[in-house]
Regions:
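Juxtamembrane/disordered regions of integral membrane proteins
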Residues: 1-163
Length: 163
């Protein structure tokens, strides 16, 4: 059970790290250069946010799937689910009183924001699943390589013993 939790949390942390790196390390300098520092910090286009989330959660799902003890696809998808569960919980536990009277979901009150969040959720779950498939494939391949190496070493030891 603990390995499962660690696998999913590792995937979530990797996804958050890659997402932050792609937004603040790649996209932010681009927007700062072309649009100036005032506009770049507040008007990051949604397309780039969706791309960064897709890029990040693909790798997060892959890592969780690879590290999982069993049910690899499930662990990969749980990275996306976990991120979308943790975020509202943090908003409920620590609401910001300066944002619309302390409403933890103030940013979801408009239809556009709700639509964007729904698209983001579907994208994250889909990409996490694709990453989980890739992690499962990598794990199976690496296990096959390890088995072949062990078999070859065992044959070499047997052939050395006969000489």
């Amino acid at each position: 059970m603990m390995k499962s939790v660690v696998a999913v949390l590792t995937g979530i942390l990797l996804a958050l790290g890659v997402g932050a790196l792609s937004i603040f390390g790649i996209a932010a300098p681009f927007f700062t250069y072309f649009f100036g520092p005032e506009l770049a910090s507040t008007a990051l286009p949604a397309v780039f946010v969706l791309f960064a989330a897709a890029f990040a959660f693909y790798f997060g799902g892959m890592v969780a799937s690879y590290k999982a003890p069993s049910r690899r696809r499930l662990h990969g998808v749980l990275v996306g689910v976990g991120a979308f569960v943790i975020s509202p919980l943090v908003n409920l536990v620590a609401p910001d009183p300066t944002v619309r009277g302390g409403d933890p979901f103030a940013n979801l009150r408009t239809p556009e924001a709700f639509l964007f969040t729904t698209v983001l959720l579907v994208l994250v779950l889909t990409v996490s699943y694709v990453g989980a498939l890739r992690g499962e494939t990598l794990f199976a391949h690496n296990q096959a390589v390890i088995r072949r190496q062990k078999t070859r070493k065992a044959r070499e030891r047997l052939s050395e013993g006969k000489d």
